[in-house]
From Swiss-Prot:
Keyword check for Cytoplasm: no
Quaternary context: Part of the 30S ribosomal subunit. Contacts protein S5. The interaction surface between S4 and S5 is involved in control of translational fidelity.
Annotated protein name in UniProt: Small ribosomal subunit protein uS4c
BP GO annotations: ribosomal small subunit biogenesis; translation
Entry-linked SUPFAM superfamilies: Alpha-L RNA-binding motif (SSF55174)
Main location: plastid
A GO molecular-function annotation: rRNA binding
Entries under SMART domains matching the protein: Ribosomal_S4 (SM01390), S4 (SM00363)
Length: 202
């Protein structure tokens, strides 16, 4: 299944707030619609499916990519769900987004694809590149690159940056301090339901 490129508002109306996909807030449904929905019995499969879809759309990855991340997480030590979130959060496109260098993950991916971003002073054009603790995220030394990212950083100042990341406005450089903890994930998600969804595939 390919990466979703359709209307983003349609997705957040169904799944709720997904800051990685869009910074728009879904409009609340009318009380009559909510009442009719609450009277319907929602299957466990649908609940797991929707949690899985939240991860896919928030991080902007394909079905195959998510399945591969689940398989890697299963082989790692620790909680499979927590490791899965760490793998997704340490993607370069997500790090750029969480640093505030881009308004969304698709926007961050575009910066990477257009070679605006460096890791440890080397240009990286792979959005799925897995960052590590003590990695420096830098802006390509071009006026256009700096103007785009500085504008995003200025807008992001009103939001709280997660503790595992720091950004120096003076040096125009981000730093991955450590692997994030569960509470720092910027998404309301039950990752265990995602693991259960893939239990027969991974």
């Amino acid at each position: 299944m390919s990466r979703y490129r359709g209307p983003r508002v349609k997705i957040i109306r169904r799944l709720g707030v997904l800051p990685g996909l869009t910074n728009k807030i879904p409009q609340l449904k009318s009380s009559s619609i909510n009442q009719s929905t609450s009277n319907k019995k929602i299957s466990q499969y649908r609940i797991r499916l929707e949690e899985k879809q939240k991860l896919r759309f928030h991080y902007g990855i394909t079905e195959r990519q998510l399945l591969n991340y689940v398989r890697i997480a299963r082989k790692a030590k620790g909680s499979t769900g927590e490791v899965l979130l760490q793998l997704l959060e340490m993607r370069l496109d997500n790090i750029i987004f969480r640093l505030g260098m881009a308004p969304t993950i698709p926007g961050a991916r575009q910066l990477v694809n257009h070679r605006h971003i460096g890791v440890n002073d080397c240009i990286v054009n792979i959005p799925s590149y897995r960052c590590k603790p003590q990695d420096f995220i830098t802006i390509k030394n071009q006026q256009k690159s700096e103007a785009i990212i500085s504008k995003n950083i200025e807008f992001y100042q009103k939001f709280k940056r997660p503790n595992h990341l720091t950004y120096s406005s003076l040096e125009k450089k981000g730093l991955v301090n450590r692997i994030l903890d569960r509470e720092s994930t910027g998404l309301k998600i039950n990752e265990l339901l995602v693991v259960e969804y893939y239990s027969r595939q991974a």
